[in-house]
Amino acid sequence: MKILDKNKNLLAEVIRSEDIIHEKNFYTEEKEEFQFASFNLKENTVIKRHIHNKQERVIKSTSEVIVVIEGTIEVEIYDLDENLEHKCILNKGDTVALFSGGHGLKAIGNSKFIEVKQGPYNPETDKKLF
């Protein structure tokens, strides 16, 4: 589920575990700063060994991915003007990719999740609390 602001800019994308039905599904275009995909591989499927070549890239903002391992998390998604655009509940196996705007998380009971984002990360300058 794509979450857009009032100007149709992509803020986030929520992927439910049960919705991962295609062998490979890229949710972002190749030109985007952050690539986001899901895979549903059959037994013995092989992704060929590979190395990602080093190359300079221009990254203008930090994208973040949250994967819920256990429990339930409420995610609030805000536009660039800090207006709440969407709230959603993520359960075990669900994922949200946060591309633009702001966000907040709340654990609904004990929860575990993995967070992935680009680095380097400077806690002094990388984010603004609101």
List each model region and its residues.
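A short, N-terminal "cap"/entry segment at the start of jelly-roll beta-barrel domains
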Residues: 1-39
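Conserved short histidine dyad/triad with adjacent acidic residue
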Residues: 39-60
